[in-house]
Amino acid sequence: MVKTEFSTNGELLMNTTFEATNSKSRVLIVDDNSRFARSAQLFLEQTGNYVACAVNDPRRALETARSFKPDLVLVDLIMPQADGSEVAAQLEADWALHSVPIVFMTVLITAEEARDGRRINGHRVVPKPPRGFDLIRVVEENLPCCSDA
């Protein structure tokens, strides 16, 4: 089932593919750039290993996470409506979501800085946009079932 929501001005707010299987890891992507969020969602889903949900309004992230129940959340650090730190704080304050790993994405960090293990508020930070298999690597390294952390 595909669920798509648009704002009153036609901007994509959320595009979700829900599947009946529990065997795939669930990744929530929160990014105000709808093209990036949708392409990341499609790329993850095309691997056959993930169910992904893209949210373009960070003010909807908590509500979406509660219904989607992600295994991992990828959050843009800088967004106009609410920044990634605010989104992370909301998720961490929710009893059902507080243990879900969060990874920040930002253009303010280089790949070298990310490899050095830079963190913001205890969360891993990766350069944005992670491309292709770099996105898969970020997801795999941060899923609770797959990471060493």
PLM region spans:
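Non-catalytic signal-transmission and effector/linker regions of two-component phosphorelay proteins
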Residues: 1-26, 131-149
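Conserved sequence signature across two-component system core domains
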Residues: 30-31, 55, 73
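Two-component/phosphorelay signaling modules centered on CheY-like receiver
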Residues: 34-53
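Active-site beta3 strand of CheY-like receiver
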Residues: 68-74
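Receiver (REC) domain active-site loop signature in two-component systems and cognate sites
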Residues: 79
